[in-house]
Swiss-Prot record:
Involved in transcription antitermination. Required for transcription of ribosomal RNA (rRNA) genes. Binds specifically to the boxA antiterminator sequence of the ribosomal RNA (rrn) operons. Belongs to the NusB family. Keywords: RNA-binding, Transcription, Transcription antitermination, Transcription regulation. Coiled coil: none annotated. Signal peptide: none annotated. Gene3D superfamilies: NusB-like. One of its GO terms (biological process) is DNA-templated transcription termination. NCBIfam families: nusB (TIGR01951), PRK00202.1-1 (NF001223). GO terms for cellular component: cytosol. GO terms for molecular function: RNA binding. CDD domains: Terminator_NusB (cd00619). It comes from the Bacteria. This is Transcription antitermination protein NusB.
Length: 130
């Protein structure tokens, strides 16, 4: 599985967890996989890592939102931001610009017309604080 695919699956897993409020991370990951597709370490680390660091990640996002509340952001955008912020804060081997570019590309696919610019702005602000 390519890293872009893993990031997309991680966003989908966080989306499911946000909607249901009760899925276990590994179950959410399994629900995103195509039949016969196997998970990988990167995908699982994104989802489990977010769950383990949810408070710090959400706080980093909150501190960089202008005129928005985290709870008012679309679930898709919130999920993309959460995956990207986890990656930026806890996966130091991945350059921040790579993470931001990947999040923007995922937003183009899954978000609305404004998602790309919104996510770019929030993540750029967060990058400056790390």
């Amino acid at each position: 599985m390519k890293r872009r695919t893993a990031r997309e699956r991680a966003m989908q897993a966080l989306y499911q967890m946000d909607i249901t409020g009760e899925l276990e991370p590994k179950v959410a990951v399994e629900n995103t996989l195509d039949e016969g597709e196997e998970t990988n370490e990167f995908l699982e680390s994104l989802v489990v890592g977010f769950v383990e660091n949810k408070e710090a990640i959400d706080e980093a996002i909150r501190q960089n939102l202008k005129k928005w509340k985290l709870e008012r952001i679309s679930i898709v955008d919130r999920s993309i931001l959460r995956v990207a912020v986890y990656e930026m804060k806890y996966m130091e081997e991945i350059p921040h610009n790579v993470t931001i570019n990947e999040a923007i590309e995922i937003a183009k696919t899954f978000g609305d017309e404004e998602s790309r610019r919104f996510i770019n702005g929030v993540l750029s602000n967060i990058k400056d604080t790390l």
